Every structure is written in structure tokens, then in C-alpha cells.
Amino acid sequence: MESPSCIQDEPFPHPLEPEPSAPAQPGATKPGDKRFRLWYVGGSCLDRRTTLPMLPWLMAEIRRRSQKPDAGGCGAPAAREVILVLSAPFLRCVPAPGAGVGGGAGSGAVQPNTGVFIFEHKAQHISRFIHNSHDLTYFAYLIKAQPDDPESQMACHVFRATDPNQVPDVISSIRQLSKAAMKEDSKPSKDNEDAFYNSQKFEVLYCGRVIVTHKKAPSSLIDDCKDKFSLHEQQRLKLQGERGGDPGDEMGVLEVESPVSPDDSLPEKADGTVNSPRALPSLASLPALASQPALASSRVCFPERILEDCGFDEQQEFRSRCSSVTGVMQKKVHENNQKTQPRRRHASAPSHVQPSDSEKNRTMLFQVGRFEINLISPDTKSVVLEKNFKDISSCSQGIKHVDHFGFICRESPEPGLSQYICYVFQCANESLVDEVMLTLKQAFSTAAALQSAKTQIKLCETCPMHSLHKLCERIEGLYPPRAKLVIQRHLSSLTDNEQADIFERVQKMKPISDQEENELVILHLRQLCEAKQRTHVHIGEGPAIISNSTIPENVTSGGRFKLDVLKNKAKRSLTSSLENIFSRGANRMRGRLGSMDSFERANSLASEKDFSPGDSPPGTPPASPLSSAWHAFPEEDSDSPQFRRRAHTFSHPPSSSRRKLNLQDGKAHGLRSPLLRQSSSEQCSIVPSARRMYKESNSSCSLPSLHTSFSAPSFTAPSFLKSFYQNSGRLSPQYENEIRQDTASESSDGEGRKRTSSTCSNESLNAGGTPVTPRRVSWRQRIFLRVASPVNKSPSAMQQQKDGLDRTELLPLSPLSPTMEEEPLIIFLSGDEDTEKVEEKKKSKELKSLWKKAIHQQILLLRMEKENQKLEEARRDELQSRKVKLDYEEVGTCQKEILIAWDKKLLNCRTKIRCDMEDIHTSLKEGVPKSRRGEIWQFLALQYRLRHRLPNKHQPPDTSYKELLKQLTAQQHAILVDLGRTFPTHPYFSVQLGAGQLSLFNLLKAYSLLDKEVGYCQGISFVAGVLLLHMSEEQAFEMLKFLMYDLGFRKQYRPDMMSLQIQMYQLSRLLHDYHRELYNHLEENEISPSLYAAPWFLTLFASQFPLGFVARVFDIIFLQGTEVIFKVALSLLSSQEALIMECENFENIVEFLKSTLPDMNTTEMEKIITQVFEMDISKQLHAYEVEYHVLQDELLESSYACEDNESLEKLERANNQLKRQNMDLLEKLQVAHAKIQALESNLETLLTRETKMKALIRTLEQDKMAYQKTVEQIRKLLPADALANCELLLKDLTHPTNDKAKAGNKP
């Protein structure tokens, strides 16, 4: 048979010329299709509980059935020769011409009829490829039987190639076809647009996050979080002020270190209290990002991690979204995430509150999809947060801060550890928050309804299919003899009848190798597990939920299976105790074998005894082969409490397929478990750090290291030890000869067998191929090692160990345990002189320092290489982005002389020198290079500003672009809706919420915040889009301000649209004066300019015309201003006047103006641009504007002249009534004035009398004071008796006077 190959653009098979004038057939291959001659082995539908580890065995079963069709009574057909035709987007399996079933190659001269095929399906529906490690010519792929039905089963198709080198070619070709088909499907379609518009998007301001203890939020949680964020911001500003506002100092002040004690990292409850250590004991091991701020580090990795102090977990993966961000952006984000900064602790920074950085752009797009929430950063053009609805427990809105809301979700900073995080956001106003909450509620309800409709695959710990999954995981990558041992251990957990049944079936098929026997056993095990799974009762499910017809069978089978589980546990405990006894025999046997290599393998096999098939299932069992979880092998982790995971310090990270060979507990093996110090990868030597040493029988080699890792494929254990612990623990007879051969070879060769390690090279191990491990030696053994070890060691190996190992002192001549770190081989190599030891120690220190220096230099080199790669990738991305932006056909050609002229002019742009406008006009007329168009626009804007100074009252607000992006806009809904409508076919803007749309959102949002009067109006998005295609965001923002304010385009976007009405009148007058027939034709059909010309003015022709033409129009607009639009419109209408006149009705004319008119060729566009340069209508436009205002005033005046008589009479009657009212009011006013005058005269009289009385009172007071002085003097002169008599006399005189007065008052 001919060697397989991929023949392109030629018919298959064999390189023959295609038949001339072959008739076209429905299924005929097209030029460019790829065809491969293969053998179709067969296919099979998979059980929904089939996982990835089971697939190789299923593939082997299909292959075996094709080789032996009658085996197992399956009656499967033999393999047939086929042609795999890759015709986009289909993958078609066609029978090979002239080849019978199971036959050889047929006639190669026959053209294959691709219209008749065995099966076909779309390439993008293929989900996974499977290789056969035992036979590289076999491969398979998985595909859904019904791609449109998510509940459909998976199908597996197996093929065989005649050459192993053909398999990668076939797979890569299918993958390329699949990618091309997926890319074609991802193009904007109606369904995609509907999905895009159905997902609600809101602009929010990210405030921060707080760790909470419960998944349900109290009503005041959002307000409490907001208060804490405000407090943190005040502290930050205060500290920044104390440091003098130095950004570098601020960085250090706000950094926080990991808490010293576990209690410091406890999260805070919603009410402000801190949990007790008992509430969350596992939080003590949380990383810094989960418990305290790390503000400086977040400044570096902010694009991926939106949190200022700590971002998301590094293990969190961002899915590649075709509608959100490119893979390059995500790669940059992930690389930025790897950067870290040193941290310092500050006492005032809270450890549980994680606010965002107010100095960064915290505005995000909050997208609510069907099943997830996405937080997209328009600043970094990436998805910074993605949460599924199943991880969100509650949403709430602020009470005091009504414009804030948040949600609580579950996160896992470490495997097996989960916590609840509350993310807080702010919206522009309260109504927007209400809309967000309503959208979330509806989305949750819809997702719950859709999820409940799906059939969930249930798995529990006792599921038969789950036990099969664990077994396939356990034997994956093992050699057939060792896998056979694991399978036999699993079979021992079955009942006696099941074991006997499987044994009989396997023996009937007469396997000839261990691999074939394993495949047969797995086949029957899978059939047994599928049968048991049908009647299996999951844990927690009672028989009450089962129908009456199946209750007896299910109950008995469920009870039987639970009984089997208990039996298995008892068997495992008994087996482990027996194996502990057998292991002692293995220890004695090691002395007889005299080889540490075999002992190491025996220990590695003994470590397999702890692997139990009854491990607990994962929390979320795999639902399908595509989503099946790859769990760590049970061999990788030790359940013993004395072992703990060590840090990897080797030169490359550990792979998931590594195994650790661990010695077991001392009670089981008669050994102690020493604690070993981790060795470095550079020296590749394992130095002991424990004081305990093993006491073993005489051997020429030391024990293997406890924590030496070996990759699974490189493990080569001797065959006689692979069944050492099988059944009774005795060696099987078939391996006795191998034992003798191994013993003889190892006794003759002192080095033994060398094993390759996956973590270090052979030179890093000792001469025997095993790492050095401490053991207890007596003084006799020490003397023996001094004498015997050099015989078995080569000088090179001794010298290598002497140079590479650290020195320790000699063991004391005593059987007691040593008092310091010791190692037998090092002791032997050590000298007796103290001076030699000191020198060697110094030498070891120097080596360590040299190694450290080399490591640091290597790290720096790697970092520099990474930075260079990033810079190179950034340059490539920039070039690619620029290429995508400028992907349009340019109108006109630009000569080399024009490029040189423009380069000279752009130099003046930097120096701000005025240039001759006639020269600029001439150069612009000759052409503009597409690559320098953005710079030329900036140059033209600068020249305009140098000649025209905008008044201060018309100047835009002086706010920077970055500051505007930090704010929230009220125009977000209108902007977000128009993103998908702006240049929907251009590759830069076609990606939904891609880099182009997010840049456009930023630009439109910034201008809406800058110009409060205009805000956002439809049409500005196209103008901004054209600017973004030729320059960066900030430059486009400056040019947009120039167009709006300096050139005056913002007038036509005002809410009253007055300027647009004037422009429509001016265009009508131009048509009336210069193209009267066309004007009359349009008027007869009632077609006003606002019907077809409004988009031309609002979008500057960008919404309907080709980008090359629009770019040339923008060239002239930057030079001449708004009148260019009238010139272009007039030229367009005049050039197509004859065709417009041929349209007879309203519909035809409108269709022509909207569809046919923009579809021009390059020649017509160049002609129009030339006419625009030669046209001058500025005077006419000014005259028409004045005319419009005059007509508007006349219209207002004429409205007053047309008032009728009734209105006049009403006004006269109203006037007479008002006159009478005025007269009455005047009379009342006169009376009031007279009263006021009388009151004023009375007031004057009273004031005069008051003044007189005050003067009289003052006189009387003076007299009183004089009399009082006289009385005092008289009292001093008279004696006391005379004075008393005088007082009595005065009383008497006073009483009669009073009596008379009273009598006078009586009537």
C-alpha cells in the first residue's frame, strides 16, 4: 500500500490526474479539500457517566472488536478502508473505491464518490481527540450525536492509519478545519446580535469588596461596606498628606503585610464584629490576597485584578470570549498578574476590607448574561471578573446609599477552601440601581428555570461507574504488569460470583499479553458497572422515590451493594495488615538480594498498598467526558499525618503525572520516617537533615530518598517485584528466574541498575543510581564502609560526591544515635584532619554563594527575556491592531513624493509653525497616506487653531480624558446600544465588547461627560469611530473636541436640532438654485432633505459610504470645516442626477439614495473628491442662513397679523376692566396716604411730649438726690432720741393724711 499522505487540490487516491470534464455531483469534492486514506475501525456511543480516564480503554475495546469481530458475541464489523474528506465545514467519511470490508487497497484509478458516505458531521462539533499510547497508528475523536441537543450522548469514532506519522497530520488538519468553521460561525449574525443585545449591560463604579461570613446579606451590609471604604479612603488621603503627596511614599504606606497570627486574617461580619478562631479555622492558611490589602501589588496587576489591595486568585481562569477580548489581551493580563511587590504592614489599614484604588479608573461594564455576570474593564479591554449564577448567593441594594448595590458570591482561594465575598458597586443614580436589581432577579429566575429543565447526572461515593473512574485514573500511565496488579486489587473488592464471572469470560478469550488481559478485564468491568448503575440507589435517596414496580429489585440491589462496600473496607483493612507482615519479609529479602535498586522498587510497590479504590468522589462529579474532572492520583498524596507537602525547588514545576514514592509507617515496615531537608535542583544532591537513621542489614548502597519524585513513564520496576505482594505475598514461579538473574547481575556489578529521575539527572544521584538517604550504622558497619565502599565506587563518582556534598563530622564509635546530621558516604569521604574540614566547609559555603549568584543571574536573565518578549509582543500587537484598523480601500493613490512632502510638514507640527494654506491645500488634493492620516489630521487641527482663536466662553471644559473616564455617565444605555451599530462589518468594531467597541465606549462616554449640553447623540459614534481607526483614544478625544467646538459641529447635535434644520434648508436652496429639475422631482415625490441627508450630516457620511471615501471627506473637513458636507452632498446628487430622475415613485427614490448611491466605484469617488476641492459655496451658505432667520422672523410676525376680531374684543373688555380696577386702587391708595399722614403727625406730637417728660423726670431725680443728702446730714447732727421722736412725729403726720385721703375716696 502506498505511504499515506495528504493530497491537496488533486483527487484521491494515488497521485493521478483528475478526470477531465468530470460531471459535477452533489457530494463532489471541491478544490482545496483534503483527503486521507484511513481505516475506519468503528464507533460507539458513550454512557453519560463515561470520563476521560475511561476513554483509552473504550478505544481499545472498539479496536479489539474490529480485529476479532466474533469476540464477545458483539458481531461488530471488521475495519474497512475509507477516505476521510475534509470539506469545509464538514468532515465526511467515504468508502474507499474498490476496497472491500477488511480488504486491501482497491484500484487507485477510480475517482471516490463523495456523494455516498458512511457518516458526516461538522468539524467544529468535534470536542476531543484520543491517542493510543500502545499503537500510535490508532486515534479517535469524540463528537456529540446531536449537537443541537445538549442532553444528547457522545459518540466515539476510531480510525487507524497505515503510518504513525500520518496521525498528527490528520488531527491538525481537522483542527484547522474546525477553527475555520468556528471562526465563520463567530461572524456577526442575527442570532449573535440578538444574544448580544439580550445581555443587559450597565456602567458601574467598582467600590471594593469585603469578606463576609454568611451567604445571606443583612439589609445594612452595603451601607456598612460603603462606610468602611470611605474611612479607608480618608486614612489614605491623610497618610498621603503626611508624606507630602509623594506617590512613591504613598505606595509604601498603603501596603499591608500578611497577618502575624491566624486571628488577624479572620473576616469581619456584617455587623462589624470579628469571627472567633473556631468559626473559620481554615482561614489561618489563607493567602495574603484573601485576608488583607496589598495595594502596591495591585497597582501592577490591576488589569486582571480589579481590587486595589488584592485581586482575584491567581488560579482563577478567565475564559476566552470571542465577544469580549482577544487572547493576546488575556495573555498580557495573566503575565501582569505574576508581578508582585514587597509589602509592609501598617497598623491603621484594615485587614478585611478591600476597597478599590480611587486613583485608578474603576468604571466597569456590568454585563448580565444568561448564566453568568461579567465585569469588563473598558480601560484594560479585558474581563476582570466572571461569576456564574450558581456561585452568587444574594444581591442587595443600599439603604442610605441608594445608588450602591452589591452581591455575595463564593470563592475558593485554595483548593478545598471557600469563603464568601461581597462585591460593592456604584451606579449613576438610584433608578439605574433599581434596573440592575430587576435585571438580576429576572436573570436568576430564567437561569434557574433553564437549569432545572436539564437532566442532572447524579454520582455518589458508592456509584459503580465512579469506582470504575477511580480505577482508570489509578492505572493511567502504568505499565501493563503494574496496572494488572492494581486491577486485581480492585477485583478483590467485588463479590465472589462477580470475580468468577469476569475470570471465566477473560479466560475464554485467551489473552496473550498483560495489556490485552487488562483491556478485557476493564471491558467486563465496565459492562458490570453499567448494569449495576441502572439499579443503583444513590446515598441519601430512599426507596420511596422509586416506582412500585422496581422497589423490590432496587432495594435488594442497593442493600447488596452497601453490604459489598462494608466487605471491601474489611478486606482492605485485612489486606493492609497482611501486607505489613509481608513487608517484613521484603526487608529480609533485601539483604539477600544485595541491591538497593530492587529494594527501592519494592518500597515503591509497597507504597501502592495505601491506595484504596474507595476514595470519596469529587464534590461535583463529571457530567460528561468533556467536563469530567481530572483529580489527582491517590498515589500522589499521603494520608499519613506525619507527611506534609513540600515546596518544589526543582528547576521545573511538578507535573500532574508525578508520583511520590514514600516509605510507610514504622510499625508496618519496621522503619522510622525521618524528616528530610529539601535539596536544590542545581546540586541535585539530597542531604539528610534528621538525626534518625535506619538500621538495615548489610548493603553496599544507601536507602532511597523519601521524597524523590519520578515521572510515571520513566518508571521501570523489575517484573518479579510487580507481583510480590499479589495474593499471598509470595513470589510467583514465573519470576523466580528473573530474581536469580537480577541477584547475579547486581552482585557482579556494584553500581546496579541506573534509573532516570524526572527531577534531576543521573549525575545528581550516587553511583548506584539511587539518592543518598541517612540510616543508622554501627562502628563495625562504619569500618566496613571505609573498606568496602571504595571497591564498588568509581573514582569519578567519588570525586563528584566529594565536590557536590556537604561535609559532616564522623560518627562516634558507638551504636548510639548520632548527635548531628550524618550520612555514611559523606563520613567515608570526610578526612580526619580538622583543618581539612574547615577548608571543605569554606569551599561548600563558596559553592553555595556561587550557586546563589548564578541562580539570581539566571532569574534576572529570564526576567529580561520575558520583558523583551512582552515588548516584542506589544509591538506585534500594535502592528496587527494598526493593520486591522486601516483595513479599508483607499481612494486615490499617494505617490512617494507626496509622502516626503507630508513628512516635512509634520515636522512643523511639532514646532507649531504656521504653514502656507495654499501649499497644504495642494498637498491634500494630491493625496494623504493612510498610515500617516491620523498625524496629518492633528497637523491640520493645529494649523486651524494657530489661525482661529476660539473665544473663552466657547472653550470646552479643561478636564483630562483620564479623569473623565473615572466618572459615570447618564448616557450609558444609548452609548451601549449604539456600539453594535457602529461599523458592524469592520473587524475592529465587529467583536462584541472587544477592544474596538470598548475604546469607542470610552471615547463617547468621555465626551458626554465633557459636553453636558450635547451629551450623546446618535451619529457621534460614527465620527468617533473614524477617529479611533487612525489614532489612539486620547488623540481621538482631542480631535473630537476640535471637530465639535472649533469647527462648530456640536451645534447640529444640540437637543433643539436648530442647526440641523438650517442645514437642511441650505441644502434645499442649493438644489433649487443649481439643480432645479432634480429639486422639482424630489418635491413632486415629497422627499425632503431630512429624509436622506440627515445621516450624512450627523455621521459625516460614515454610516453609509465606504471608509476610504469617508477618510478623504474627513481630510477636507479638517481643512475647510462644515461646508465640506454640503459640497460632498451636492456633488453626490449632481453626479447621479440622471439615475435619480429615472426613479418614478417615492420608494424607488429613497431606495436609490440609501443603497445605490453609496455603492460607487473608485473612479466615481475620486471624481467627487476632485469636485469638492474645486467648489466654493461659502457665500451662498452664509446667505441662505441669513435668509432662513429672516423667514423665521417673518413667520412669527405674520402669525400676530392673522389674529381675528374676537380676540381683539376680548382684549378690549379685559383692558376696560383693568382700567376700572386701577381707578379703584388709586382711590384706595389716596385714603391710605391720608391716614399715613395723620398717624405721622400724631407720632411727632407723642415724641415731643415724651422728650419733655424725660427732662422733667431727670429734674425730679436731681431734687430727690439733694433732699436725700440733706436728710443724711440732719441725722448726723441730731441725737438718737430726738431722731426717734422725729420719726414718730412724721408717722403721725403721715397716718392722718392717709386717713383723710381714704375718707375722701369713700362716697
From Swiss-Prot:
The keyword Cytoplasm applies. GO terms for biological process: cellular response to insulin stimulus; vesicle-mediated transport. May act as a GTPase-activating protein for RAB2A, RAB8A, RAB10 and RAB14. Promotes insulin-induced glucose transporter SLC2A4/GLUT4 translocation at the plasma membrane, thus increasing glucose uptake. It is found in: Cytoplasm. Widely expressed, including in pancreatic beta cells. GO terms for cellular component: cytoplasmic vesicle membrane. Keywords: Acetylation, Cytoplasm, GTPase activation, Methylation, Phosphoprotein, Repeat. The modification N6-acetyllysine is found at K484. This is TBC1 domain family member 4. It comes from the Eukaryota. Residues 757-767 have a biased composition (Polar residues). The modification Phosphothreonine is found at T575, T620, T649, T770. Phosphorylated by AKT1; insulin-induced. Also phosphorylated by AMPK in response to insulin. Insulin-stimulated phosphorylation is required for SLC2A4/GLUT4 translocation. Has no effect on SLC2A4/GLUT4 internalization. One of its GO terms (molecular function) is GTPase activator activity. The modification Phosphoserine is found at residues 258, 261, 320, 324, 348, 351, 573, 577, 595, 598, 616, 624, 673, 758, 761, 764. The modification N-acetylmethionine is found at M1. Residues 237-246 have a biased composition (Basic and acidic residues). InterPro entries: DUF3350, PH-like_dom_sf, PTB/PI_dom, Rab-GAP-TBC_dom, Rab-GAP_TBC_sf, Rab_GAP_TBC_domain. The modification Omega-N-methylarginine is found at R584. Residues 53-209, 319-475 form the PID domain. Residues 13-23, 615-624 have a biased composition (Pro residues). Residues 1-30, 237-276, 330-360, 603-684, 732-774 are annotated as: Disordered. Residues 927-1121 form the Rab-GAP TBC domain.
